[in-house]
Amino acid sequence: LRGLLDKIHAFLDANPTETVIVSIKREGIGNATDQHLSKILKTHYATDRDRWFTDNRIPTLGEARNKVVLIRRFAIDESLEKENDGAGWAIDAESWPDNCADGICSSGEIRVQDFYEVTATHNISKKITFAAEQLARSAKTVCDLSKDQTAADVEAAKFPVFVNFLSASNFWRANCWPDKIAAKVNPSIIDHLCRKHNEPSTGKPTGDGSTGIVVCDWVGHEGDWDLVRCIVGMNAKLETR
């Protein structure tokens, strides 16, 4: 973890207007608990408030620039529940929906598509459909950019962060390994973004057209970055408002 964070910090030093979202969960056997993990992260890693955003809420991009934004998929120690004026420590995604087509964390902060158990090749089409549906849900959101909003207005208009996983696998079927799935999912999502994204049958966009966070697999393979270009391009349209 230390080596990974060193690379993240180096990236942020070189690109101070960017942000990096880090999602962490505890896995594996042993006697360690979520609470142990939370204390280790707080004490030894997420120590610099100028570099880490660890409030239990979704930040604005301005707040997040040049910082690591921590999403925790684990419970926290009782001592950390008092952090941030009693709101808790880090963005709460403890109740992360498992293997879901459309799920919302109990905190309401994150809406996720993470259907990953592709048991056979015919299920890859289901994965593509679920990913496209999540893109459509994200596209419908509208960000209020009026400058005279109060904090209460911002909170009332808040919507969850959309997280959309394109990755999936089945270890026991070689034709459902991550690279094979990506070879079908990625071109399909590129096609969706180019021809259908935020374009309903009426021809009028329904929202801002943002894609949300799209977690990709095998991007840049053999120099093909079209998927990333499409995602960045769709989100960049917000700059024209």
Tell me what each language-model feature is.
Residues L1-R241:
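Catalytic cores of phosphodiester-bond hydrolases, prominently lipid phosphodiesterases
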